[in-house]
Amino acid sequence: MRSQFKDEHPFEKRQAEAARIAQRFKDRVPVICEKVENSDIPEIDKRKYLVPVDLTVGQFVYVIRKRIKLPSEKAIFIFVNDILPPTAALISTIYEEHKDEDGFLYVLYSGENTFGEKLAIDISSLDFSDIPDYV
C-alpha cells in the first residue's frame, strides 16, 4: 500500500529529516503511522512519532488506540511491510528489520486483518481420528 506521507513529501526531504532525527534523538526511532485505506477505523490525528527504542509493539498499539479513541472491545491490527509484527517485539528491532530507505519506519493500522494473515485457527470442527497416535 502506498503511503500518503511518501506521496506528500519528496524522498530527499524525508531522508534528511530521518537523518536529523537519528542524530538528535539516539534513544528514539522515527515512525510514520497511517490508517489502511478503506478501513472502518478512525483516522489518527497525527502521523509522525518519535518512539522510544525500548517501547514494544504492543505498547505502541496502545498509543495508537488512545489517539484514535478506539474502544477496548474493537480490534486493531498493525502492519509493517504487510506483516503483523509480534506484540512483544521492541520497536527498535522492528525498525532495524523494516525501516524504509528514507530512514522512517512505516506502520499501517486497520480494524481488520487486511493482509489475510491468520492469527488463530478454530480446529474444534476438524476430525483428527484418522491420524495415527493422535491424542
Curated annotation (Swiss-Prot):
It is a lipid-anchor. Induction: Induced during biofilm formation. Keywords: Autophagy, Cytoplasmic vesicle, Lipoprotein, Membrane, Protein transport, Transport, Ubl conjugation pathway, Vacuole. A lipid is attached at G116 (Phosphatidylethanolamine amidated glycine). Pfam families: ATG8. One of its GO terms (molecular function) is phosphatidylethanolamine binding. One of its GO terms (cellular component) is cytoplasmic vesicle. The keyword DNA repair does not apply. CDD domains: Ubl_ATG8 (cd16128). Disruption phenotype: Attenuates tolerance to oxidative stress when PEX1 is also deleted. Leads to hypersensitivity to ER stress and causes the loss of virulence when YSY6 is also deleted. It is found in: Cytoplasmic vesicle, Autophagosome membrane; Vacuole membrane. The keyword DNA repair does not apply. The record marks G116, E117 as: Cleavage. The C-terminal 19 residues are removed to expose Gly-116 at the C-terminus. The C-terminal Gly is then amidated with phosphatidylethanolamine by an activating system similar to that for ubiquitin. GO terms for biological process: autophagosome assembly; autophagosome maturation; cellular response to nitrogen starvation; endoplasmic reticulum unfolded protein response; mitophagy; protein transport. Residues 117-135 form a propeptide. PANTHER family: MICROTUBULE-ASSOCIATED PROTEINS 1A/1B LIGHT CHAIN 3-RELATED. Ubiquitin-like modifier involved in autophagosome formation. The atg8-PE conjugate mediates tethering between adjacent membranes and stimulates membrane hemifusion, leading to expansion of the autophagosomal membrane during autophagy. With atg4, mediates the delivery of the autophagosomes to the vacuole via the microtubule cytoskeleton. Belongs to the ATG8 family. This is Autophagy-related protein 8. It comes from Candida albicans (strain SC5314 / ATCC MYA-2876).
